Amino acid sequence: MLRLKNDRFIRALLRQPVDRTPVWIMRQAGRYLPEYRQLREKVPNFMAFCKTPELACEATLQPLRRFPLDAAIIFSDILTIPDAMGVDLHIAPTVGPVIRNPVRSAQDVNRLQMPPVEEALSYLFDAIRLTVKALDHRVPLIGFAGSPWTLACYMTEGQSSKTFLTARAMLYQQPDVFHTLLQKLTTLTIAYLNAQIKAGADVVMLFDTWGGLLTPSLYRQFSLDYLSQIAAEVVRQKNGRKIPLIFFTKNGGQWLESIANSGCDAVGLDWTTDIGQARRRVGDRVALQGNLDPAILLSNPESISTAAVDILKSYGQGSGHVFNLGHGIDPSTPIENVAALVETVQNFSIKNEEPINSYYR
């Protein structure tokens, strides 16, 4: 197998020497790009778009044509697994995901399908294979999934929410039923990520977007324990190469040490956590990813550069940092501000003194 021409991102995740801090952007393929909006016009239905491998591949590649990013992330959605399980999923243009048959009882959980993922989600794996071929080993490709807790939030609530009160109440009212749902989601997520790796993903990431809504005790029981199970069962080596695993729990800074001990290689931080303090807290256990506030990208290039440099300085010297936002980029972000961010990170490189012997050579 040919080595990656740019393995900076993977090296940083594995805390190996790098020449500069790698950078990519959560939701880097999306509505802030005019070419993406034009592409979406071909298939207005979002899930139908995701299920068209050629379009998903093109959307994945678009940001790399504009910006010298150090990784690509496959264009998809975290709700592909619930969709494959038989929930009646609809993506409303102004509302977001709506599930018309929410899962709120043991009977509802028992009715969920457990399909072979390589068949039910073949479109995603086809998109990965197309993208790997198109990338031609230029940069690594990230595969991803939603955390079981985050997927369960949507499935039980029936739609997006700032509080997911229905989901949280169900933890107290029907904990055994909720655990059964989470275990089903965990089983499928493991198979899903492994199939993405088989198709060609170089890195996999779990988005625990709503983990920060939980109490410390409930976070461990209903989110982190399942993330740890995934970490233990996802393929971590392929053809002699390590496959790094990233966990991102939004508003999860208070549990940073626990997340670092869960079996992942890197922890994503949102913008509410100081990255320098986070580095001191986790030591050399994991790499860190983040953590610029996406809102600053709505300001001006000078403010963006200052904030980015502050984060780079706060992390300090040495490898183990992947620069990213603290959450997904806002659709209204000006293109020139993204360019300013990427340029700043590339130009402000705190180099290692160690010689760089590529992991892939």
From Swiss-Prot:
Pfam families: URO-D (PF01208). Keywords: Cytoplasm, Decarboxylase, Lyase, Porphyrin biosynthesis. The keyword Transferase does not apply. It is an enzyme of class 4 (lyase). It is found in: Cytoplasm. GO terms for molecular function: uroporphyrinogen decarboxylase activity. Substrate binds at R27, Q28, A29, G30, R31, D77, Y154, T209, H327. The record marks D77 as: Transition state stabilizer. GO terms for cellular component: cytosol. Transmembrane segments: none annotated. GO terms for biological process: protoporphyrinogen IX biosynthetic process from glutamate. SUPFAM superfamilies: UROD/MetE-like. It catalyses: uroporphyrinogen III + 4 H(+) = coproporphyrinogen III + 4 CO2. Its EC number is 4.1.1.37. Pathway: Porphyrin-containing compound metabolism; protoporphyrin-IX biosynthesis; coproporphyrinogen-III from 5-aminolevulinate: step 4/4. PROSITE patterns: UROD_1, UROD_2. Catalyzes the decarboxylation of four acetate groups of uroporphyrinogen-III to yield coproporphyrinogen-III. Belongs to the uroporphyrinogen decarboxylase family. Homodimer. This is Uroporphyrinogen decarboxylase. It comes from Coxiella burnetii (strain CbuG_Q212).
